[in-house]
């Protein structure tokens, strides 16, 4: 086996590609939910930025079908790489390799 395969998480993962979490890998297993925001009481991944709400969005992993559900709760918006702004409060299913922008283009994550 090559070393790249050995280092990849077994489930899904979220990769920080821009901003304070660039280069970080957050492992996800079936049903895991990650809450991103600026509030230490409302989020478990904290981004201190004027464009990030206290509870900005959640990302939930569905390992059975290999997709993620993203739900926006913010004022500034959660966007996909094609510029689509997610509808606030409505869960959106996104496939792996989707890039998600949190508030603005300065904070971006790729779901894998």
Residue ranges and their predicted role:
Residues 52-54:
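Amphipathic hydrophobic-ligand
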Residues 1-50, 60, 64-65, 93, ...:
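Intrinsically disordered, low-complexity acidic Ser/Thr-rich regulatory segments
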Residues 57, 61-99:
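Forkhead-associated
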């Amino acid at each position: 086996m090559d070393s790249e395969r050995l280092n990849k998480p077994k489930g899904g993962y979220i990769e920080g590609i821009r901003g304070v979490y660039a280069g970080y890998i957050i492992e996800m297993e079936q049903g895991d939910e990650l809450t991103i925001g600026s509030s230490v009481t409302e989020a478990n991944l904290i981004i201190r930025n004027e464009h990030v709400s206290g509870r900005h969005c959640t990302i939930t992993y569905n390992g059975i079908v290999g997709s993620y559900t993203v739900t926006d709760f913010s004022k500034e918006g959660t966007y996909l790489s094609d510029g689509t702004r997610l509808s606030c409060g409505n869960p959106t299913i996104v496939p792996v390799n989707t890039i998600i922008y949190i508030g603005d283009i300065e904070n971006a994550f790729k779901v894998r």
